[in-house]
């Protein structure tokens, strides 16, 4: 049985893709063994992220570390997948000639054939094309062991924000046909999955073709998935404010399975910076979306992405972001220092903000967000939360770990038969990034 080591960088879409790489290899070889140490593997894969420079350079650092393994085991296959593969292509082979296969997010289904071609010809294989929907037509049926699962409903992005490489590495937006998505979710539900997370770079741009040739939008998809037997909870990641329509907002009013948690990236609170980023909305328009959502779901927890130190960002513009964060009361969020990416329009902008100042802004924004997260955690003490039990606690092997609808980890004392089940937990203690709870007796 082939032994496979895979390291995944970046977003949840990459996590989904990594699972699919393992699936296509398992189908090809009649099963595989996933190992946690690279030196045990017959196949080593790096599923990469190019959103930030540090993530990209870490890939080449990791490749350097596995190079000696290739010298010891000439038959070892080393592969680079994901967005760095799409961006760099043949340059990866030039920089690291011991790499055997390089493939992008849309060609991962071709991995088994690429490995065969490498072994037959002795030549490194590169395929970073964008065949769109073909990938999903060639993936084996989803198999899961947990109570939650990702389902990719669309890929790519056509927004072309000035700082972002996604349209260049994952291609333009394309949606899976509605029936394909529903079949996968129904199959997962039959395997015991309770929670579905619909994935895409911009899920609210979903336009899936139906059997009659009509187009299904994202709000309609949510309503259909809501009625699939066995699915008890729904999430989606990630959405774009520009297409967050009233019909999607109304889903929060009508669909109780849709969790009271939303990740909606704003990036900045400054209209000038948002314009320079080519985001396509203003801070006021973003606030309007949130106001409508919270009128329907007062308990909605909102997370976001922020970039500090975007070229030309002034102190006043940063203060506008800080004020927006306080006004909206963002929950757990991701704050990054701007990282110029080759080939994007923003990479050509003049940047005169010292790195030390960018770090200060990063820390100041994180401080405000973490304080709000801690406040929300405290308000949950004494409440009863419906939770999905994920497995053994990462903090204490004698405890279990569950997740609330608003994306909190709850550690509690339970029994193994509770894993992958939905249970009610009373929150007894709150910490910075987790909660403690106890089972509510029936």
Curated annotation (Swiss-Prot):
Segments forming domain MTTase N-terminal: 2-120
Cofactor(s) required for function per UniProt: [4Fe-4S] cluster
Binding site for [4Fe-4S] cluster 2: 157, 161, 164
Alphabetical list of Pfam families matching this protein: Radical_SAM, TRAM, UPF0004
Cofactor binding annotation: Binds 2 [4Fe-4S] clusters. One cluster is coordinated with 3 cysteines and an exchangeable S-adenosyl-L-methionine.
Enzyme Commission code: 2.8.4.3
Annotated [4Fe-4S] cluster 1 binding sites: 11, 49, 83
Domain of life: Bacteria
Compartments reported by the entry: Cytoplasm
Keywords: 4Fe-4S, Cytoplasm, Iron, Iron-sulfur, Metal-binding, S-adenosyl-L-methionine, Transferase, tRNA processing
Catalytic activity: N(6)-dimethylallyladenosine(37) in tRNA + (sulfur carrier)-SH + AH2 + 2 S-adenosyl-L-methionine = 2-methylsulfanyl-N(6)-dimethylallyladenosine(37) in tRNA + (sulfur carrier)-H + 5'-deoxyadenosine + L-methionine + A + S-adenosyl-L-homocysteine + 2 H(+)
Top EC class for this record: transferase
InterPro entries recorded: Elp3/MiaA/NifB-like_rSAM, Methylthiotransferase, Methylthiotransferase_CS, Methylthiotransferase_N, Methylthiotransferase_N_sf, MiaB_methiolase, rSAM, rSAM_horseshoe
Domain TRAM: residue ranges: 378-441
PROSITE patterns: MTTASE_N, MTTASE_RADICAL, RADICAL_SAM, TRAM
Residues in Radical SAM core domain copies: 143-375
GO terms for MF: 4 iron, 4 sulfur cluster binding; metal ion binding; N6-isopentenyladenosine methylthiotransferase activity
Oligomeric and partner information: Monomer.
HAMAP family according to UniProt: tRNA_metthiotr_MiaB
Protein role: Catalyzes the methylthiolation of N6-(dimethylallyl)adenosine (i(6)A), leading to the formation of 2-methylthio-N6-(dimethylallyl)adenosine (ms(2)i(6)A) at position 37 in tRNAs that read codons beginning with uridine.
Family: Belongs to the methylthiotransferase family. MiaB subfamily.
Protein name, as recorded: tRNA-2-methylthio-N(6)-dimethylallyladenosine synthase
